[in-house]
Amino acid sequence: MARFRSVFALSALALAASALAACTPAVSSSAPRDPFASPIVPGQSARASAGGGRATIDAPSPRSGSGTVTVALVGGAQLPTETAQAFTEATGFTVAVVSIDGVGSLPKTSADVVLGLDGADAVAASAAGTIASTAPRDTSTLAGTAVEGAAAAIAYGRDDVCVIADKSWLSANGRSLPTSFGDLTSPRVRSLLVVPDPTSSSVGRAFVQEAAAQTGEGLGAFAQSLSPRIDPSLGAAVGVWTAGGHVSQGYVGQLVGGEAEASGAYPLVVAPRSLAAAAATNTGADSYGAPVSSTCIARILYAAATASPASDGAESLIAWLQGERAQRLLATAGSAYPIDGGVAADTKAAWLMGISGDAVVPDETVASPEAITAWLATWNSALSAPASTQPEGEDGDEPAAPSPAPVVTRPSAPDPGTDTEDED
């Protein structure tokens, strides 16, 4: 009887095991051994992690060769080390990088190619003869990205210029996140903003263009009410941002005037959207910085050779940047939103840069040089004679600004370190 019970029990176990196997999916051989070894991020999937979405640009193959390609990065553009190494592995060319804040400095670089031009930069550089006059070989000009008057400019990404807010600082100090240009001049927000000098920085100039578009003839009055701190470069501006210490060293290292782990007393900074990706939290799924969308100006990133005919290395890099591998690497690092939106899924660019919809939009920086000159003159004139402002706390029952209060500087701002005695 005991033997019968034992045989019956074993048979029952075998039947149960067979039933369980029939209703339990097999574990994929590609599944991670420890599913919690990597941070959980929104929308993460095995397919996306393995290679991302399908590319949509019909990019030609870049040519191979040897030698060094000197790359000028303008307007906060990034070419991460991993991306440069991948280019070298694919083509044989090595890369040397030099950073500049505006296209006016391009002739000093002896660069073979420039990355990070926006439409206004491309037009100005083409008129000055500092980029090639013809399009490079082996590249594709995507519909909607051609820049009239700058045939050499080839789109490879997007990185709008916005006001980037330090969410933690605003929350800790009882301030609301600005939602419009008008909010920037409110008593509890004005004088909290730092802007890279628009006369020398492409990023600062783009911000003035958006301010002019939103305020029209009121640009001067807006600038007076805003009363921002002006720093000589994007790197210096990021260095006095209250969340500056959270920005990755790789990002800061490719900014003019950048200083790793530097932070200051200004919770609002004018910068590219990619700054939010560079200030990601440890999870990689959130950021210390939030782009204020209503302040953004759409900015396409262009690459251009600096000479005609372009060197093989320059044309190879431009062609490679349009390929799926490069587009995915830029998006993964959050260095740019890929112009090929099909590869953006499950990347820092998709999670943190705040861009939705089509990647290709009209470049809003494109304007006549005369208009840009007039806007900058109005801006600088207004800041040289700022309007008087009432002390904070007079707009109702709201308290005055907490210490430290930023010290406002003018377009000819002194060394950004001069205000550090007010920073706790």
Question: Which residues fall in each region the model found?
Answer:
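Periplasmic solute-binding protein
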Residues: 119-128, 149-176, 206-214, 298-304
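C-terminal capping/gating helix-and-loop segments adjacent to ligand/active sites or protein-protein/ligand interfaces
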Residues: 328-407
